Design a protein with these regions (language model features):
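Alpha-helix capping at helix-to-loop junctions
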Residues: 13, 30-34, 59
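Fold-independent oxyanion-binding glycine-rich loops
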Residues: 18, 51, 57
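A broadly conserved amphipathic alpha-helix scaffold signal in soluble, globular proteins
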Residues: 25-29, 87
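A conserved regulatory-domain signal marking ACT and ACT-like small-molecule sensing domains
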Residues: 54-143
Length: 143
């Protein structure tokens, strides 16, 4: 009979409980592991798994609340561009749930989760020359 002690790892990667989520993700990706023990003052206090990270992503992205996800490509980057976009949305009585700025080789993209389901109103409001409206979609429409 093979026992757990015969096959267990003894040099295990860990993360501190107060570490950033991104740090845990980096360790898990670098080590190709799906579970990471969480430590506090040299004591095991829990684990974080891939599913925990997926859940956190859904929460952070605002997906769980449903609404509209807008993707903009910034065409004229300048100081205050996010403030300009936020003001346009606020003036139209639309609430921003989350904003993610993604700097890619093909440009700067801003993804905004809005607390509305009115895709046509969003399209009508976001018309500045400072950005291109790439996509407007409803989120959390499955299940």
């Amino acid at each position: 009979k093979t026992k757990v002690g015969d096959v267990m790892l003894t040099h295990v990667a860990t993360i501190e409980a107060d570490a950033l989520l991104e740090d845990a993700i980096k360790v898990m990706r670098t080590k190709s592991i799906g579970v990471l023990p969480v430590m506090e003052k040299n004591q095991l206090v829990g684990i974080i798994t891939n599913n925990d990270i997926f859940d956190a992503f859904l929460k952070i992205s605002g997906y769980e609340n449903g609404g509209v996800r807008v993707t903009l490509k910034i065409t004229k980057e300048h100081h205050g561009i996010l403030a300009v976009i936020a003001k346009e949305l606020a003036d139209a009585q639309m609430n921003i749930e989350t904003i993610v700025v993604n700097r890619l080789s093909k440009g700067i993209f801003v993804e905004i989760q809005l607390a509305t389901k009115d895709t046509e109103k969003v399209k009508a409001v976001l018309t500045s020359d400072d950005y291109e409206l790439v996509d407007v979609v409803l989120t959390n429409t499955i299940m």
